[in-house]
Swiss-Prot record:
The keyword Hydrolase applies. It holds the Pfam family Peptidase_M1. Signal peptide: none annotated. Its main location: cytoplasm. Aminopeptidase that preferentially cleaves tripeptides. Also has low epoxide hydrolase activity (in vitro). Can hydrolyze an epoxide moiety of LTA(4) to form LTB(4) (in vitro). Pathway: Lipid metabolism; leukotriene B4 biosynthesis. The active site is at residues 337, 424. It comes from Botryotinia fuckeliana (strain B05.10). Zn(2+) binds at residues 336, 340, 359. This is Leukotriene A-4 hydrolase homolog. Binds 1 zinc ion per subunit. One of its GO terms (molecular function) is metallopeptidase activity. Keywords: Cytoplasm, Hydrolase, Leukotriene biosynthesis, Metal-binding, Metalloprotease, Nucleus, Protease, Zinc. GO terms for cellular component: cytosol; fungal-type vacuole lumen; multivesicular body; nucleus; NVT complex.
Length: 646
C-alpha cells in the first residue's frame, strides 16, 4: 500500500498544492491547547481523526415529536493511532446541545465546546491526560440533544404527510450534517460499525439490519407509548451514512432480499413500481463487481420534501416519491442507489474534494446495469441525458469555476455548495474514457480488483490512480495506452471534458421532433410521441431548451396540450416542460410551476425551477418560496435562499 501511495503522488508533480496530508505533522492549532496532531486529508472536519479513529458507535436515542428533538446518549469507541502523542480528542459538532461527556465511565473529565467555525461547526475537545498508547480504545459517552438548528433532521407535522394522521422525521447526513445530530468524526475518511437503539412512538428505520422492537413504555400525560427499535451495522460505514426515519411506515416485499417501506396509502403503488426490477438489478451488478455484502437491500420511499433523488443509506435506500410515477420509468434511481452499495458505501471517497470517486463510479455502474438489462444503446442514451446535465452545471458555474473540476478545493467551504452533476457526470466520463482506452474486457477485470482492494476503506484520487496503474503494470498494451492519460487535465482542468461519440439510435427521433419545433408553424399531435419512453420525451425537451430562440407562448401551450405535459405524474417530464414554458414566458405555466414547487422537495427540480421562475416573475418565485420554505428540507431551503438572492 505504501508503494502504491508513493507512486500515486510522485507522478502528479505539476500539482504542488496537493500534498500527502497523512504524512504532514504540525504542533499547534488555533482552536484550543497546543497538541501534536497529524493533519488529515479531509479539510471539512474539525476532528483530529489522524490521532484517534472511531471504531464503533452506539446510538441510544429517543425521538420526541412534540419537541422535535432527538436526545439520548451516543457512545464512541475511539482507538488511539499514535503512541500518547495526543492528549485530547476533538469531535465535530454543529448546534448540538452537549450535556455531559464521560471518558471510560468517568464523568469528571474535562471537556470544552470551542468557538464555532463556519461552515463546519463547533469542535468538542475532550481531554485525555497523558494521551493513550497506540491501539488503546477509549469510550466517550456523550449525553446530548439536537436543537431547532439541526441541519440533518426534517420534522413533518401530520398535515405535511399524505394521510395527515401522524408526524414524521427523517435524516439526511450527507455531506457534513451528522455532526448536527451527535458529536462525531464527521468525515468519510473514518468508518465505524454501529448499534442503533432508537425509542419512538412510531415505527423506526435505520441504516442497519433490524433486530426487532420491544421494551414498550407507556406514555405520560396522554402521550403515545413508545417502543425501542434496535438495529446493527457490522460493516464499517462513514458518518454521513448514519440514517434514521420514523413515522407511519408500512412495509411490503419487493424481492427475496428486499422490502419497500412507505406510507400505508402509497404501499401498493410503490410495491408495483419496484418489485419487477430490484432483484434483477442486484443480480446484474453482482456479476459486474461481486456479491452484495449488506444482506438486505430495501427502499424507504420518503415524503415529498426529501431533497435528493435517493440517499444510499446502507440496508435502507432513502428515495424520493418522484420515482413512484406509475409507469416504472424512473426506477433507474434504484439502480443508482443500489450501485452505491459498492461505490461509496464499501469503498468511500476520503473527502468531499474527491466526491467523483463516489458518484462517478456509481453512475458508471448504474449505466452498466442499464446496459445489461436493456441493451448497450440504453447506456449511451442515459449518458446523453447526463451530458446535458453536465453542460447545464458548467454553464451555471462558469466554465472556469473551481466546482467544475474533478478534484475540487473545499478548504473553508461547505461541501453542499459544490453539489452538482459535475462529480457524477464528469466522473462517469473519466471512467468511461479509461474503459475505452484499455478495452472493456481488461477494464472489467479491474472493476472487482478495485472494489476488493479498497473494500471497507476510503481513498482519494491519487490512490485510485496508483491502484489503476499498478493493476495494469503487467499488461504492456494497457500500460502503453495509459501513458496517454493527461491526469492533470482530468483532475484539475475546469469545464467540460471532450465529448465522446455516443450511439444516438434511441435519441435520433427525439432530435428530429425537436428540429420540427424550430418552425413557428409546426402543429403538434399526440402521435408525435406515441410509444416513446419517458426518457425519450426528456431528451426531446432538453433539445428544445437548447434553442437559441425560445418557443413562443402559443407554441409552449400547444406542446403542453398535445403531449399531456401539464398534468403528467412524471415530474421528470412536467418540470422540464415548465422549464420550456418559463423560457417562452408562457404565463399559463407560472402557477402550475409554483404549485409543483409546493409538492416536490427534490433539489434537482426545485432549484432548477426557482432559478427559471425568478427570471420571469421574481415576485411569484419569492412568494412561492416563503409559502413553502418550511416544507423543504433545511439543506434544500438553504440552497434555494442562495439561488434567490439578487
Amino acid at each position: 500500500m505504501n508503494t502504491l501511495l508513493s507512486i500515486g503522488r510522485s507522478i502528479i508533480t505539476s500539482a504542488p498544492r496537493i500534498v500527502s496530508a497523512r504524512q504532514t505533522t504540525v504542533t499547534a492549532r488555533t482552536m484550543a491547547t497546543v497538541s501534536t496532531i497529524n493533519m488529515p486529508r479531509d479539510p471539512n472536519t474539525l476532528s483530529n481523526y489522524n490521532n484517534w479513529r472511531t471504531k464503533h458507535t452506539i446510538a441510544d436515542l429517543a425521538i420526541d415529536f412534540t419537541k422535535q428533538r432527538v436526545h439520548g446518549t451516543v457512545t464512541l469507541q475511539l482507538e488511539s493511532i499514535t503512541d500518547k502523542e495526543s492528549e485530547e480528542i476533538i469531535l465535530d459538532t454543529s448546534f448540538v446541545d452537549v450535556q455531559s461527556v464521560a471518558v471510560d465511565g468517568n464523568k469528571t473529565g474535562e471537556w470544552t465546546l470551542e468557538k464555532r467555525i463556519e461552515p463546519f461547526g463547533t469542535p468538542l475537545s475532550v481531554k485525555i491526560p497523558g494521551g493513550a498508547a497506540k491501539g488503546t480504545v477509549i469510550a466517550l459517552a456523550i449525553t446530548l440533544s439536537t436543537t431547532d438548528k439541526c441541519t440533518a433532521l426534517q420534522w413533518l407535522t401530520p398535515a405535511q404527510t399524505s394521510n395527515k394522521k401522524f408526524p414524521y422525521m427523517f435524516s439526511q447526513c450527507q455531506a457534513i450534517h451528522n455532526r448536527s445530530i451527535f458529536p462525531c468524526q464527521d468525515t468519510p475518511d473514518v468508518k465505524s460499525t454501529y448499534d442503533f437503539r432508537i425509542r419512538s412512538p412510531l415505527p423506526v428505520l435505520a441504516s442497519g439490519l433490524p433486530r426487532g422492537a420491544g421494551s414498550f413504555v407507556h406514555g405520560e400525560n396522554g402521550e403515545s407509548g413508545t417502543l425501542l427499535y434496535s438495529f446493527y451495522q457490522e460493516i464499517p460505514m462513514p458518518s454521513y451514512l448514519f440514517a434514521l426515519a420514523s413515522g407511519d411506515i408500512a412495509t411490503a416485499s419487493i424481492g427475496p432480499r428486499s422490502l419497500v417501506s412507505t406510507g400505508p396509502e402509497e404501499l401498493i403503488g410503490a410495491k408495483w413500481e419496484l418489485e419487477r426490477d430490484t432483484e434483477k438489478f442486484i443480480e446484474t451488478i453482482e456479476k459486474i463487481v461481486y456479491p452484495y455484502e449488506w444482506t438486505q437491500y430495501n427502499v424507504l420511499v420518503l415524503p415529498p420534501s426529501f431533497p435528493y433523488g435517493g440517499m444510499e443509506n446502507p440496508v435502507f435506500t432513502f428515495a424520493t416519491p418522484t420515482i413512484i410515477s406509475g409507469d416504472r420509468e424512473n426506477v433507474d434511481v434504484v439502480a443508482h442507489e443500489l450501485a452505491h452499495s459498492w461505490s461509496g458505501n464499501l469503498v468511500s471517497n476520503a473527502s468531499w474534494e474527491h466526491f467523483w470517486l463516489n458518484e462517478g463510479w456509481t453512475v458508471y455502474l448504474e449505466r452498466r446495469i442499464i446496459a445489461a438489462v436493456h441493451g448497450e444503446a440504453y447506456r449511451d442514451f442515459s449518458s446523453i441525458i447526463g451530458w446535458k446535465a453536465l453542460e447545464d452545471s458548467v454553464k451555471l458555474y462558469g466554465e472556469d469555476h473551481e466546482f467544475t473540476k474533478l478534484i475540487v478545493d473545499l478548504k473553508g467551504k461547505d461541501p453542499d455548495d459544490a453539489f452538482s452533476s459535475v462529480p457524477y457526470e464528469k466522473g462517469f466520463h473519466f471512467l468511461y474514457y479509461l474503459e475505452r482506452l484499455v478495452g472493456k474486457p481488461s477494464w472489467d477485470k479491474f472493476i472487482p480488483h478495485y472494489f476488493t482492494t479498497w473494500k471497507k476503506k476510503s481513498l482519494d484520487s491519487y490512490d485510485f490512480k496508483a491502484t489503476l496503474l499498478d493493476f495494469f503494470a503487467s499488461d504492456s498494451a494497457a500500460s502503453k495506452a495509459l501513458e496517454s492519460v493527461d491526469w492533470d487535465s482530468w483532475f484539475y482542468k475546469p469545464g467540460l471534458p471532450s465529448k465522446p461519440e455516443f450511439d444516438t439510435s434511441l435519441v435520433d427521433k427525439c432530435y428530429a421532433l425537436a428540429k420540427k419545433w424550430e418552425s413557428k408553424d409546426y402543429t403538434p399531435s399526440p402521435s408525435d410521441i406515441e410509444g416513446w419512453a419517458a426518457n425519450q420525451v426528456v431528451v426531446f425537451l432538453q433539445q428544445v431548451q437548447l434553442f437559441t430562440t425560445p418557443l413562443t407562448p402559443v407554441q409552449s401551450q400547444a406542446m403542453g396540450k398535445a403531449y399531456n405535459l401539464v398534468n403528467t405524474k412524471n415530474v421528470e417530464l412536467s418540470s422540464r416542460y415548465f422549464g420550456v414554458g418559463l423560457a417562452a414566458k408562457d404565463e399559463t405555466v407560472y402557477q402550475p410551476t409554483a404549485e409543483l414547487l409546493g409538492k416536490v422537495g427534490r433539489m434537482k427540480f426545485v432549484r432548477t425551477l426557482y432559478r427559471k421562475l425568478v427570471v420571469v416573475d421574481r415576485k411569484l418565485a419569492v412568494e412561492t418560496f416563503e409559502k413553502n420554505k418550511d416544507f423543504y428540507h433545511p439543506i434544500c431551503r438553504d440552497q434555494v435562499e442562495k439561488d434567490l438572492k439578487e
